[in-house]
């Protein structure tokens, strides 16, 4: 997860105010592989696409579950992660439980959303039924520890690929490319873009790339970290912060859930690239290749679009 050399203090809003850097830095652009899949995902990584995505994802991808492959352990290299998971017939996947469109707890407690459907597609390629997926709630700050400690087999949780994270975990994908944006209350006319954040209380999530971006590029803003984006939204509605920042598609989900109170700044205009990847254990190259191949096939056969 991103780290800084700054300290933090408690804030009355209920979050954590990150200490300011004494210099202005610029986050390097992500080196995104431009495969045909990634180019097409990049073109769909807009708020308009997010809204369309949400109609399917919030329903858990419709009535049909992703196809489950008829596989045998012998189909995979001996001793591989794929063989072990196929033999066990179960997989543990970390995802968000509080993010509309991507991962949100449903009425039965199980998460629903686009990330959840991607997880089902990956499990299905191993011959694992959706009912045999153990979902573990993750937040931005615990994704790497969960992978490193073996608490999950995969993390599919709006998980931006970046070089800092790749030092401790590996990624398959990206399977979606979003971008950082801003969300405010509907009557807010003061914040018109990232250039108007000076002196504003900006809410984001500890351990997230959006929070790091604010620290590095807007030292004149007051960053307030929370553990989840739903808590950021609560703080915004309660007047404890001025603006929430994270990926446009995540914010679009919250706006769709509460359009009377929330709006995107400049229709969700983005100022970064956020390529979402599937997190897995560092050094498991065979598993990463398998996951990449499965994601590519899902795009080609239409199951990605149906998710």
Task: Give the residues covered by each predicted segment.
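Short helix-initiation/N-cap motifs at beta->coil->alpha
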Residues: 133-145, 189-190, 206, 224-234, ...
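Acidic, polar ligand-binding/catalytic clefts
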Residues: 133-196
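N-terminal secretory signal peptides and thylakoid transit peptides that target proteins
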Residues: 32-49
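C-terminal motif of bacterial Sec signal peptides marking the signal peptidase cleavage site
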Residues: 55-57
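Extracytoplasmic small-molecule ligand-binding "clamshell" domains
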Residues: 71-155
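Periplasmic-binding protein-like
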Residues: 176-184, 252-293
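A ligand-binding cleft/hinge motif common to bilobed small-molecule-binding domains
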Residues: 142, 158-167, 215, 237, ...
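Extended ligand-binding regions for polar small-molecule ligands
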Residues: 59, 68-73, 116, 125, ...
């Amino acid at each position: 997860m991103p780290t800084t050399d700054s300290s933090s203090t408690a804030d009355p809003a209920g979050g954590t105010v990150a200490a300011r850097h004494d210099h202005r830095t610029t986050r390097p652009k992500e080196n995104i592989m431009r495969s045909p899949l990634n180019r097409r995902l990049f073109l769909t990584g807009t708020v308009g696409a997010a809204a369309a995505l949400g109609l399917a994802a919030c329903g858990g991808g419709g009535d049909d579950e992703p196809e489950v492959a008829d596989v045998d352990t012998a189909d995979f290299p001996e001793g591989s992660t794929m063989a072990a998971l196929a033999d066990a017939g179960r997989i543990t996947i970390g995802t968000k439980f509080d993010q509309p469109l991507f991962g949100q707890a449903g009425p039965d407690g199980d998460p629903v959303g686009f990330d959840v459907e991607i997880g089902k597609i990956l499990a299905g390629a191993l011959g694992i039924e959706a009912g045999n997926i153990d979902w573990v709630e993750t937040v931005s700050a615990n994704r790497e520890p969960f992978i490193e400690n073996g608490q999950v087999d995969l993390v599919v949780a709006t998980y931006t690929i970046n070089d800092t994270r790749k030092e401790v975990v590996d990624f398959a994908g990206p399977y979606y490319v979003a971008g950082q944006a801003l969300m405010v209350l509907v009557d807010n006319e003061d914040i018109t873009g990232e250039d108007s954040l000076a002196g504003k209380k900006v809410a984001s999530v500890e351990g997230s790339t959006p929070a790091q971006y604010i620290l590095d590029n807007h030292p004149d803003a007051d960053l307030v970290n929370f553990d989840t984006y739903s808590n950021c939204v609560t703080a915004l509605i309660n007047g404890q912060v001025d603006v929430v920042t994270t990926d446009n598609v995540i914010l679009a989900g919250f706006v769709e859930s509460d359009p009377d109170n929330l709006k995107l700044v400049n229709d969700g205009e983005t100022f970064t690239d956020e390529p979402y990847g599937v997190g897995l254990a560092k050094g498991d190259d065979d598993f990463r290749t398998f996951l990449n191949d499965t994601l590519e096939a899902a795009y080609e056969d239409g199951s990605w679009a149906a998710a």
